[in-house]
Structures are given as C-alpha cells and as structure tokens.
Amino acid sequence: MTTLLALFQRPDGGSDALAEFERRYAGEHLPLVAGTPGLRSTEVRRVSEALGAETDLVLITAMRFDDRAALDAGLASDAMRAAGRNLREIAPGLAMLLVLEDADDLLP
C-alpha cells in the first residue's frame, strides 16, 4: 500500500482562520479528493498534542492507494489536479505532502 500524507500547519489568524480552513477543507477540498481514481480510503485527523515537542501542525490526512502506480495515476487525474488548485487557494503554503511506502520488512 502507498499513502499520500498531507500535513497542515495552523493558519495565521487564530481560531477563526482555523475554523474557516476546516470548513473549506471539508466542504470543498475533500469532495474533490474523493473523486480521485484509485483512491482506496481517506482518513483525516486533528493533531491534539505533540509529545515532548512544539508543533504548529493541526490536521493530517492519509490517502491510501494500492501501490505507487495507482498513486501516480491518481495524482495525474483531473480530480487530483482540481484538488491541488483548491488546496493552493484554501491553504497557501500550509501543506506538506509526503509519499509513504509500507516498510513491513522492518517489523519484527
């Protein structure tokens, strides 16, 4: 399984700005992402605490695909391109995207 992980920093503007970001993320962005070909599941989590560290991360989304080829096809799709444009509008400079590959060989 290949995962596209999106980490979101707290927007400037306090709790009102965060509430507006979350409203638009849920109402605009996630419906666009849902139309991505090959997307198996999406999980969204709020960051409640960073143990032993400071963080400005407020939201993390995991989008799972069968493999890297499925992710690449999804990224090239019209749905994901539209989601990317929307993300640049609602969260400019606030997102970091990571591609994660299973590492089961590291587990005992």
Task: Show which residues each predicted segment covers.
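Macromolecular interaction modules
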Residues: 1-108
